[in-house]
């Protein structure tokens, strides 16, 4: 009996997250101790949206060529190419780019769009980012405002930050409770 050898995949270690602020590995931009660096002029102290220098043509992160962004790169595979749309169920685009109007079945829920629950209005059949109804208050259940804007009594609310009733986390003045 001949034994088959199973090919092994070499393990690579990743250096951790890459900071979009300074470009170094090991931390994220929100944890960066260096000043923000402008994407346009590479100077510190301001963002590209606030830059007074003429806008520079940037190179694509995928291929290094100027004139297009990574999402439009002809050299790299389109990450949305295999994406399945939650609205129409077709492959090749995502819901926010969908040109289909109407309530067709499909998507990753096996053809049952009604299983999707909208966090904004509480209805089924769409996601919050596609909601046309408006926001829903988690405190009183009414549509048109969010819980931190609710005018009704907040006795039943429980703060996620301090676990005390009467307010919600956005209005909490207590320090965070460590678990």
UniProtKB/Swiss-Prot annotation:
A zinc finger (CCHC-type) spans 17-34, 36-53, 58-75, 83-100, 116-133, 135-152, 157-174. One of its GO terms (cellular component) is nucleolus. Its main location: nucleus. Phosphorylated. It comes from the Eukaryota. It is found in: Nucleus. The lineage of its organism: Eukaryota, Fungi, Dikarya, Ascomycota, Taphrinomycotina. InterPro entries: Znf_CCHC, Znf_CCHC_sf. GO terms for molecular function: DNA binding; mRNA binding; single-stranded RNA binding; translation activator activity; translation regulator activity; zinc ion binding. The keyword Manganese does not apply. This is Cellular nucleic acid-binding protein homolog. GO terms for biological process: positive regulation of cytoplasmic translation. To human CNBP and to retroviral nucleic acid binding proteins (NBP). Keywords: DNA-binding, Metal-binding, Nucleus, Phosphoprotein, Repeat, Zinc, Zinc-finger.
């Amino acid at each position: 009996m001949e034994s088959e050898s199973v090919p092994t995949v070499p393990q690579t270690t990743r250096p951790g997250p890459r900071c979009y602020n300074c470009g170094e590995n090991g931390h994220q931009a929100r944890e960066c101790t260096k000043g923000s660096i402008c994407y346009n002029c590479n100077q510190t102290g301001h963002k590209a949206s606030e830059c007074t220098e003429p806008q520079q043509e940037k190179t694509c992160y995928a291929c290094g060529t100027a004139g297009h962004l990574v999402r439009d790169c002809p050299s790299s595979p389109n990450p949305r190419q295999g994406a399945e749309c939650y609205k129409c169920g077709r492959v090749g685009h995502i819901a926010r780019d969908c040109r289909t109007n109407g309530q067709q079945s499909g998507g990753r829920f096996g053809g049952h769009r009604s299983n999707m629950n909208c966090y904004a209005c509480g209805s089924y059949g769409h996601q919050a980012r596609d909601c046309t109804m408006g926001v829903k208050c988690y405190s009183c259940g009414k549509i048109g405002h969010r819980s931190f804007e609710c005018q009704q009594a907040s006795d039943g609310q429980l703060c996620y930050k301090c676990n005390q009733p009467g307010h919600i986390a956005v209005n909490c003045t207590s320090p965070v409770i460590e678990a």
